[in-house]
From Swiss-Prot:
Protein name, as recorded: Exodeoxyribonuclease 7 large subunit
Species of origin: Streptococcus pyogenes serotype M49 (strain NZ131)
Subcellular location(s) per record: Cytoplasm
Self-association state and partner proteins as the record states: Heterooligomer composed of large and small subunits.
GO molecular function, one term: nucleic acid binding
Known EC number: 3.1.11.6
Residues of the signal peptide: none
Gene: xseA
GO terms (BP aspect): DNA catabolic process
UniProtKB keywords: Cytoplasm, Exonuclease, Hydrolase, Nuclease
Reactions accelerated catalytically: Exonucleolytic cleavage in either 5'- to 3'- or 3'- to 5'-direction to yield nucleoside 5'-phosphates
Xref: InterPro entries: Exonuc_VII_L, Exonuc_VII_lsu_C, OB-fold_nuc-bd_dom
Record family assignment: Belongs to the XseA family.
Domain of life: Bacteria
Amino acid sequence: MADYLTVTHLTKYLKLKFDRDPYLERVYLTGQVSNFRKRPTHQYFSLKDESAVIQATMWAGVYKKLGFDLEEGMKINVIGRVQLYEPSGSYSIVIEKAEPDGIGALALQFEQLKKKLTAEGYFEQKHKQPLPQFVSKIGVITSPSGAVIRDIITTVSRRFPGVEILLFPTKVQGDGAAQEVVANIRRANQREDLDLLIVGRGGGSIEDLWAFNEEIVVQAIFESQLPVISSVGHETDTTLADFVADRRAATPTAAAELATPITKTDLMSWIVERQNRSYQACLRRIKQRQEWVDKLSQSVIFRQPERLYDAYLQKIDRLSMTLMNTMKDRLSSAKENKVQLDHALANSQLQTKIERYQDRVATAKRLLMANMASQYDSQLARFEKAQDALLSLDTSRIIARGYAMIEKNQALVASVSQITKGDQLTIKMRDGQLDVEVKDVKNENI
């Protein structure tokens, strides 16, 4: 009679075979990811091809080091061991390593991270800072021994001597490189004497340049308050640091040129050009003022100053005549009133009435004289004030105070810019005039 095995015994036997089979200890398998749903820790999914499917397990530690995100339908190459799960009698592969089929893991990780950061807005143009036109100190984050720092120093020194270069020695590849780049970007931003940063390194493989594709480096450049120029690898190399930086330079020399957009020669030419423009503007202004002075000096007021106050003198004469006639009329009227009063009083027998009329006459006379005197004083004061204002414009009075008036060809001279060596001048003074010849002209500001 045949011995029947229990399901448990058969399963244990098969598991023992699986565990002891050297071919199942390390299996190289290609398949398409199926039934994948990302979990917080361990990942469970299927690998399939056109004819078969196998369950797959990836522990959390392996998944964390994967470097790219698993996606439904992605074809991958895995290394793992096949095991049998006794309770269900099913077998699966426990994946120890995986990479995309046909494309490197780093290349896939690059594309996935680029897609993620693009969606989050890290590379948008609106976040880019403008580079300053003039800098006094540039921070450089790179290896102290590479050609990058030498090229930057040489180019900056040639384009704008005097600009300082501050090197932040940084590990640019391998373990810990990304962390050093981030730390030095933050150190540079704590300084107040830097105008911008250049972050870069020489060329290399994608593995060599990978520190500049790390998300923490992208975030540090994005958060930098200092404008950042990225110069990573050769012209054909592109990293995520290039996308997030404010400007990307193909070479260290190009980065140095971007950092010093205006050379010292350009600046000096600009200063000279501005000086010339300012000088010409000043000359035009002086010429305009001189023409105004010349025109004013030839006006009627300066050639015949007495005509300035002729009209006022005539008005004063008219007012004086009017005042005198008014005073005469009022005196005549007062005399007539007095005669009438005297005649009336002569016919009166009352002494008190006479005295009262006499008092009224005396009061009226005083008021009249006071009013006439007040009007006369007021008109006289106005006349004297107008006369003083007009006489202050009289050149003869100005000369009388000790000043001199210089004429050239009967035209008033107001500035030494009107005079040249050999000119014949007339100097008018209070007691005569001098005819002189100019021996020398010196410009001095008073």
